């Protein structure tokens, strides 16, 4: 009995394979699209793609084109071909503005760009592109059921950009004394704090700004030292005002003692 079932399964598999190969070689668009739809419904997306990529160029403007291009776009998505899926969904949404699938296509297209966003340490061109696509979706469909997920994706991407900006500012601080360039890290930290006023890295950024100003003051010529020591002291006060129990307090307090000791020579003049 088991042997019979095994033989039948093999025969069915060969029959299915033969049907697929015949459809690929066929010039009949109806044969290709019918079998592609069957494969799509059964989750065989790679075969769906192979058939529809052959058929789709000849179907533009035809009555069933909308369905075909949606299936092709979704098949790209399901097989994680996100670049192809992103542009396919974008094209679908543009070409079929009245389609009931347009909203879904717009969201999935934007999500495809999100999937290509790299880790924060790499170039973020794709992250900015994904944010642009997601924001466009949010503006177009403010009441969409996809809105909660769209907002989650936007937050994740903006958090990534925030972390990258912070790490760049932090790196500037770490090399400031070595290169004797203190203005650059101060400017970068100021830009970061202005761009991300509610950042979770604010305590860190405020300390790094203070630390940079502290280094700047101690490495200054006498004619500019007093002013820079005063600026460093003000940065310390800003840090403590933001968080009196800052994790940097022990280090910052020691730096402040040195700043005040340096300032005494000017108060005695």
Locate the predicted segments by residue.
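Acidic, polar-rich low-complexity tracts and alpha-helical solenoid repeat scaffolds
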Residues: 5, 16-269
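Hydrophobic core
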Residues: 12-14
């Amino acid at each position: 009995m088991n042997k019979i079932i095994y033989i039948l399964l093999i025969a069915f598999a060969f029959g299915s394979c033969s049907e697929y190969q015949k459809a690929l070689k066929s010039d009949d668009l109806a044969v290709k699209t019918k079998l592609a739809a069957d494969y799509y419904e059964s989750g065989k997306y790679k075969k769906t793609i192979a058939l529809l990529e052959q058929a789709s160029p000849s179907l533009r403007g035809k009555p069933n084109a909308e369905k075909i291009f949606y299936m092709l776009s979704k098949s790209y998505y399901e097989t994680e071909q996100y670049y192809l899926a992103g542009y396919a969904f974008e094209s679908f949404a543009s070409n079929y503005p009245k389609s009931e699938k347009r909203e879904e296509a717009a969201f999935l297209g934007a999500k495809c760009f999100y999937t290509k966003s790299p880790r924060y340490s790499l170039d973020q061109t794709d992250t900015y592109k994904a944010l642009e696509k997601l924001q466009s979706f949010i503006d177009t469909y403010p009441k969409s059921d996809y809105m909660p997920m769209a907002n989650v994706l936007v937050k994740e991407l903006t958090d990534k950009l925030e972390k990258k900006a912070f790490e760049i500012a932090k790196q500037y601080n770490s090399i400031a004394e070595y290169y004797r360039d203190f203005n650059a890290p101060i400017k970068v930290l100021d830009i970061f704090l202005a761009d991300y006023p509610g950042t979770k890295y604010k305590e860190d950024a405020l300390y790094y700004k203070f630390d940079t100003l502290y280094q700047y003051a101690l490495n200054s010529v006498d004619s500019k030292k007093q002013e820079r020591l005063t600026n460093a002291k003000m940065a310390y006060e800003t840090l403590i005002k933001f968080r009196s129990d800052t994790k940097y307090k022990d280090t910052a307090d020691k730096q402040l003692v040195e700043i005040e000791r340096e300032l005494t020579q000017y108060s005695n003049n």
